[in-house]
UniProtKB/Swiss-Prot annotation:
Its cofactor is Mg(2+). GO terms for cellular component: plastid. The lineage of its organism: Eukaryota, Viridiplantae, Streptophyta, Embryophyta, Tracheophyta. RuBisCO catalyzes two reactions: the carboxylation of D-ribulose 1,5-bisphosphate, the primary event in carbon dioxide fixation, as well as the oxidative fragmentation of the pentose substrate in the photorespiration process. Both reactions occur simultaneously and in competition at the same active site. It is found in: Plastid. One of its GO terms (biological process) is photorespiration. The keyword Nucleotide-binding does not apply. Heterohexadecamer of 8 large chains and 8 small chains; disulfide-linked. The disulfide link is formed within the large subunit homodimers. It comes from Cuscuta exaltata. Keywords: Acetylation, Calvin cycle, Carbon dioxide fixation, Disulfide bond, Lyase, Magnesium, Metal-binding, Methylation, Monooxygenase, Oxidoreductase, Photorespiration, Photosynthesis, Plastid. Residues 473-498 are annotated as: Disordered. Binds 1 Mg(2+) ion per subunit. This is Ribulose bisphosphate carboxylase large chain.
Length: 498
């Protein structure tokens, strides 16, 4: 390097390493309506001050790096840098803090969840100065939301397509999830739909394996759909899983489903990836297909309380990327999910405007500016005794999906579907009559079983089945509501089934 070049490069530049907090911790910053806001749960390494840890997150997820670089002088850092603008201690946890970071909108490509996540949950999660890091929530501003198509159709359009109103929809995942031939698989689909279900579903790991290639499955399932529709007079569907090893193959399967005239297909959005999911959502809107989303792999990312990404963030990302249904946990079944936390992200999926509510884990007010809503799917270890609780918790705009709770009926698949449909209709009627499902749920199911032998048999089989494990991911003590009665809703439902 010549002396002249060295002198010019050194003007206004001091090489070396300086604390992140000198540039990226700005407690006086007033957030803008166009900022993307993030709440991170930060656990610093011993000796690292919380302000430095929060600033490091802001820096490493936006414009910063580990040392000063002279090219900083070629742009406006004040315009593009992320800012840690508030830090609060987590009560009841040692050395754990919530760091709030604001990102300028220009840091992100329009309509790309992939780019959004690459920055905000990228390399910063491996930063050595942090023992653990978790993204608890995001505020997506209207200016950015408007760059996304979102769900292909949304809740109201789905109801209109299916001509089903005033109750939750009923589904069933076909079991065993792997190993059936296409013809036997289609037979199970037909029996469940004929028995009264609205949907059946491919399991998430059913793609195109040697025992059942995708094209054969699609054909036999389409036959089952049309036969059950003709016999019941109701519109039926099966979630045909279009997830594949390449986007081209995925879209080929979606095209074949459209040619068969089926109403809905399916995608595993986390294992398949956000780019593939957004592409499929666009195809579904253009071609009149509903899109069911499975969240396989989510617990790897969201289950641990101190590291990863909370599912409420993954739910928001899905609403941006596109999907008409997404699995959301059950509260009362076999899968992880605390009631208040689950209800929080269910509202974020369905509602147009959701206020900040820390008692449900919602850190920011979210305005979706009329982006279509997503139907939550309750699935995993549920059966007829859960029906009152599920109806109460999830309301009408939901899908209640019973796999083993349908196919495990002692009399077969169709009677299992009948039992679930009768239980649902009884709960909806009781609710509409003003009865308290929380207090009278078990009695409602018992009374309905007197005139439905299928339901009575199901009640007998599953009367002792419960999944009583405390959830791993819970609200922080300072975020919990003070309740007069600490009994959970599930406890009320499981009092006496005699």
């Amino acid at each position: 390097m010549s002396p002249q070049t060295e002198t010019k490069a050194s003007v206004g530049f001091k090489a070396g390493v300086k604390d992140y907090k000198l540039t990226y911790y700005t407690p006086d910053y007033e957030t803008k309506d166009t900022d993307i806001l993030a709440a991170f749960r930060v656990t610093p390494q011993p000796g690292v001050p919380p302000e430095e840890a929060g600033a490091a997150v802001a820096a490493e997820s936006s414009t910063g790096t580990w040392t000063t670089v002279w090219t900083d002088g070629l742009t406006s850092l004040d315009r593009y840098k992320g800012r840690c603008y508030r830090i609060e201690r987590v009560i009841g946890e040692k050395d754990q803090y919530i760091a709030y970071v604001a990102y300028p909108l220009d840091l992100f490509e329009e309509g790309s969840v992939t780019n959004l996540f690459t920055s905000i949950v990228g390399n910063v999660f491996g930063f050595k100065a942090l023992r653990a890091l978790r993204l608890e929530d995001l505020r997506i501003p209207p200016a950015y939301t408007k760059t996304f198509q979102g769900p292909p159709h949304g809740i109201q359009v789905e109801r209109d397509k299916l001509n089903k109103y005033g109750r939750p929809l009923l589904g069933c995942t076909i079991k065993p999830k792997l190993g059936l031939s296409a013809k036997n698989y289609g037979r199970a689909v037909y029996e469940c739909l004929r028995g009264g279900l609205d949907f059946t579903k491919d399991d998430e790991n059913v793609n195109s394996q040697p025992f059942m290639r995708w094209r054969d499955r699609f054909l036999f399932c389409a036959e089952a759909i049309y036969k059950s529709q003709a016999e019941t007079g109701e519109i039926k569907g099966h979630y045909l899983n279009a997830t594949a090893g390449t986007c081209e193959e995925m879209l080929k399967r979606a095209f074949f489903a459209r040619e068969l005239g089926v109403p809905i297909i399916m995608h595993d959005y986390l294992t398949g990836g956000f780019t593939a999911n957004t592409s499929l959502a666009h195809y579904c809107r253009e071609n009149g297909l509903l899109l069911h989303i499975h969240r396989a792999m989510h617990a790897v990312i969201d289950r641990q309380k101190n590291h990863g990404i909370h599912f409420r963030v993954l739910a928001k990302a899905l609403r941006l990327s596109g999907g008409d249904h997404i699995h959301s946990g059950t509260v009362v079944g076999k899968l992880e999910g605390e009631r208040e936390i689950t209800l929080g992200f269910v509202d974020l999926l369905r509602d147009d405007f959701v206020e900040q509510d820390r008692s449900r884990g919602i850190y920011f007010t979210q305005d979706w500016v009329s982006l279509p809503g997503v139907m939550p799917v309750a699935s995993g270890g549920i059966h007829v005794w859960h029906m009152p609780a599920l109806t109460e918790i999830f309301g009408d705009d939901s899908v209640l999906q019973f796999g083993g709770g349908t196919l495990g009926h002692p009399w077969g698949n169709a009677p299992g579907a009948v039992a679930n449909r009768v239980a649902l209709e009884a709960c909806v009627q009781a609710r509409n009559e003003g009865r308290d499902l929380a207090q009278e749920g078990n009695d409602i199911i018992r009374q309905a079983g007197k005139w439905s032998p299928e339901l009575a048999a199901a009640c007998e089989v599953w009367k002792e089945i419960r999944f009583d494990f405390k959830p791993v991911d819970t609200l922080d003590p300072n975020d919990k509501k003070q309740r007069d009665n600490e009994d959970t809703l599930a406890d009320k439902f499981f009092g006496d089934k005699g």
